[in-house]
Amino acid sequence: MKKILTMLLMGVTLTTSAQTAREDINANPFLAGSNYVDYDRQLPNFIYTKAPKGYVPFYFTHYGRHGSRWLIGKDDYNRVIRPLQKARRYGKLTQEGERVLGLLEEFNKTTDKRLGDLTTVGERQHHGIGKRIAQHFPEIFLSKNVAIDARSTVVNRCILSMVAECEELMAANPTARIHNDVSEALQYYLNKDWEGKVKESSRHEDRRRIGEFNDRNTHPERLMKVLFNDQQWAADSIHRHTLMRQLFEVAINMQSHDNSPIDLINLFTPEERYDQWRINNVGWYVRYGNSPMTDNNMPFSQYNLLTNIIQTADTCVALGKTQATMRFGHEVCVMPLACLMELGNCNVSVENLDELDKYWQNYKIFPMGCNIQLIFYKPAKGQGDILVKALLNEREMTLPVKATDTPYYYKWADLRKYWTEKLEKFNK
């Protein structure tokens, strides 16, 4: 009964979120990009709740995703270009189709040996994040000889993102002692492959049901008229639903680049952009969120990462010294970690895929450069409870335990107990 009541209350409080998602994307079409969203296109106001009187920050721990990048797949660009080139050979492109193909062919030249690489936009995102971290928590990052341990997965774009943030931290405090580490030995918690119950649950994804959802929300007819002058030829010769989705992926990721044909996003109407976002929202939720379809187990893919965060915090809190731990990886870790930690509404469980957009919006969790920060506070004088505050993409988040009298500040002992028991229960 309690669970049902919770979901009913959730419906009351979160129904406006569906309207907000549509309004968000109409106002800022780039949010339809899901994991391709440029971090700097949805910055918060950076107004934070002051710590309880007498408390000061002393430890910072974090996991962050790399910044904006080129698309990864070897065929991600060419699979869009090929059908348009085929249409050009048969004289089936409209004038707009010719323009779009020309833009894509020209841009494709820049992708040579660049697939998956960090872009200048991505580098800039991390310079901004690093600079703000130092500004927001000077008690930690401007303290003399502060120790900063920064680790990255072995992927170049993650390493360069780490470098960009650390450059800003060093610029803010030349006395900082920064240790950088990159190794396969760290992958077991920075970016671990699925295994055990998580891997088994991933196999429960109902591809037929998701495919039907995707088809219901893909309406290529208008776009095909924009690109092709012969609709019968297009229907017979082009996989129209597939082309629409793949062209959208290329167009929406143009925000990851400086001097790119970013206006390609205008090929899609507001309704089409929203539909394509809903498709991706569902896909990410089922594979990485707290989805009933995958047994509500996918967030536990970050079991090792949360364990590392807890254990490292134990050591640093016991030492009591001013220091920081930074980790750099991927959205496939940030997304389930945010769910596992139960930051804000990230861990909501929704059965009806058609209703998901009302309760859960992926662009709020994992844009390019997304990050989770935990800041620990202790009494400036004397003894007292250690407090912790969570930020998701530099926004204050609620946590799944009772807060102190000051919103967004929680007793670390309570939070640690909750997370530890949750992990232990899963591991039984």
Tell me what each language-model feature is:
Residues M1-A21:
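Bacterial Sec-dependent N-terminal signal peptides
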Residues Q19-D149, T153-T325, G329-K428:
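Signature for phosphate-centric chemistry
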